[in-house]
Amino acid sequence: HVHTRYSFDAFIFGTTASPDDAYKYAKGSPIKHPLGFDMQLDDPLDFYAVTDHAAWLGMIRAYADPNSKPGQLDFASDLHGLNDPENLNTNTFTKRAGLFASLISTELVEPSKNPLKMLGAYLNEDTIYGTAAYDRETHQSAWRDIAEAAERHNNPGEFTTFIAYEFTSSGPGQSNLHRNVIFQNSKAPIQPFSIVDSANPE
């Protein structure tokens, strides 16, 4: 499965490629590895789907931008400029691994202190909206970009694309099962369903 800059893990570990970049790569164009070298397929593919993590889709990239609304949250300062060119090197791996571990276990799941936001989350049965770190517009904008990129690059009979995302829930011992949710047409929801909504894939 394929991740872009919108997946929390991919962005933390240096991925800056967009969904458009991913589709161009699948069709045979070179793409830049986070460490600066080019990668290219030996043969173009016939079909492809960008399957970014539904959970926190687009959020880590937003935290890294100090000018964005999510980037102004207190914990986000550690992420500012994370994937600026001067920081894309092996010297930042330890920092990235630490950020990955701390974000997943603490900041991203802290409940919001805004009572109106919490009420809205409860009334709409929208769990993710009730967390302090979540910004609906950022999340939906990333998903919209993924869906629109799939539509732009879809050329049936030559190169087939699918709107898709990854749903992964953790089990005992932090084991997990990756599920790629793939839509058969352009009728996708306004935002993907993730483990933050429910750990039950059914």
Where are these regions (language model features)?
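Extended, charged catalytic domains and RNA/DNA-binding interfaces, predominantly
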Residues: 1-202
